[in-house]
A protein has these predicted regions:
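Conserved Class I SAM-dependent methyltransferase catalytic core
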Residues: 105-160, 317
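Conserved SAM-binding loop
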Residues: 62, 130-131, 285, 305
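DnaQ-like (DEDDh/DEDDy) 3′-5′ exonuclease domain used for proofreading
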Residues: 1-83, 92-106, 114, 158
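Flexible, glycine-/basic-rich loop-and-beta segments that form/coincide
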Residues: 162-227
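Conserved proline-anchored active-site loop of SAM-dependent methyltransferases
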Residues: 79-95, 145, 282-296
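Phosphate/ATP-binding catalytic cores across multiple sugar-kinase/actin-like superfamilies
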Residues: 66-69, 73-76, 115-116, 222-223, ...
Length: 327
């Protein structure tokens, strides 16, 4: 299934609409046809689980237009979501955005901003958002993010190297495109972040060439400072991610589904581990194949996923049933 097969009737609003029209459009809607899924299968929902403060503690998958769904979630989740990850349409001409060419770019910008403004309201004050884009809209995406979240809350531009330069892409008479961009923003400067370290490789381990009287290895940091291998955490991850292969280069993974643009679980694991902790709420309002939700479930996070296309049943829902069953 390609994104071109997934034609969308998206909802936009802009400054030409009267404020009352916008308010009516974004009034909270009633969610219907709820069902509960657990290890025993599907059940009729008899109510949502809540904590002592009345906060919903169930994981939610919502089928519907994500603009309306986001607006409807505000009552329950405003200020409560710790992490948002989205992998929105890249506006390539092959992703369902088949509008009049003269409005294509502006339509994408309006589409993104409408949703980001509501998404920001859902984030907790120590929350973060990651938005994944390619060269088509990454730079315009940053301008929108600067406007919605504030330029001072821009944290990093993460470059994800897709893998080996092979196949039809290598035939271009130009520098070969080999990366996507992930924009990392926080809601405030007081954001939650867990620094991640990678194991040392063989060359890096050789730098611990000193040995003290007790036989412990160390390396010299400064004239007066040593770092012992036993105390070293590893190599802190930078904003260049070249150690996670995309499905453009990995073709035999059991994760792969019939869906263009699917992201590997390792990518979401890194993002979720970096910017959330167990029990925190993770939101993905472009749920797609459900990778974010599957990884969040495995990592003990609460999650909310939104997808309007009918494949929500055959892709994210069926995938999560397997995860819930213990995959």
């Amino acid at each position: 299934m390609t994104k071109e097969d997934q034609k969308r009737d998206e909802i936009f609003y802009n400054e030409t609409l009267a404020p009352d029209d916008i308010n009516r459009l974004l009034d909270a809607k009633v969610f219907t046809n709820f069902k509960r899924i657990d290890k025993k299968g599907e059940h009729k929902l008899d109510g949502l689980n809540r904590d002592e403060k009345g906060i919903i503690k169930d994981n939610l998958i919502i089928k519907g237009n994500n603009l309306l769904a986001l607006a409807s979630l505000k009552k329950e989740f405003a200020g409560k979501v710790k992490l948002i990850y989205i992998d929105p349409p890249y506006n390539t001409g092959n992703d369902g955005f088949k509008y009049n060419d003269s409005f294509n770019h502006s339509s994408w910008l309006v589409f993104m901003r409408n949703r980001l403004e509501i998404a920001r309201q859902l984030l907790s004050d120590d929350g973060s958002i990651y938005i994944q884009l390619d060269y088509n809209e990454a730079h315009y995406g940053k301008i929108i993010m600067d406007e919605v979240f504030g330029r001072n809350n821009f944290q990093r531009e993460i470059i994800w190297k897709l893998g080996g330069l092979a196949g039809y892409k290598s035939l271009a008479n130009n520098f070969i495109r080999g990366h996507e961009t992930i924009l990392f923003y926080s809601k405030t400067q007081n954001f939650s972040f867990n620094k991640i370290y990678l194991p040392y490789n063989e060359a890096q381990l050789k730098r611990f060439s000193g040995v003290d009287k007790e036989g412990k290895k160390y390396k010299i940091i400064t004239k007066d400072k040593k770092l012992y291998l036993d105390n070293a955490k590893g190599v802190p991850i930078s904003d260049l991610w070249d150690d996670i292969a995309s499905f453009q280069t990995v073709v035999n993974s059991q994760e792969i589904m019939d869906f263009d643009g699917q992201k590997p679980e390792k990518l979401l694991l890194r993002i979720i581990e970096s910017s959330s902790n167990k029990g925190d709420i993770v939101l993905d309002y472009h749920a797609g194949t459900g990778t974010t939700l599957a990884v969040a479930h495995k990592m003990g996070r609460q999650y909310v996923g939104i997808e309007q296309m009918d494949y929500i049943h055959e892709l994210p829902e069926s995938r999560l049933k397997k995860v819930i069953a213990g995959e």
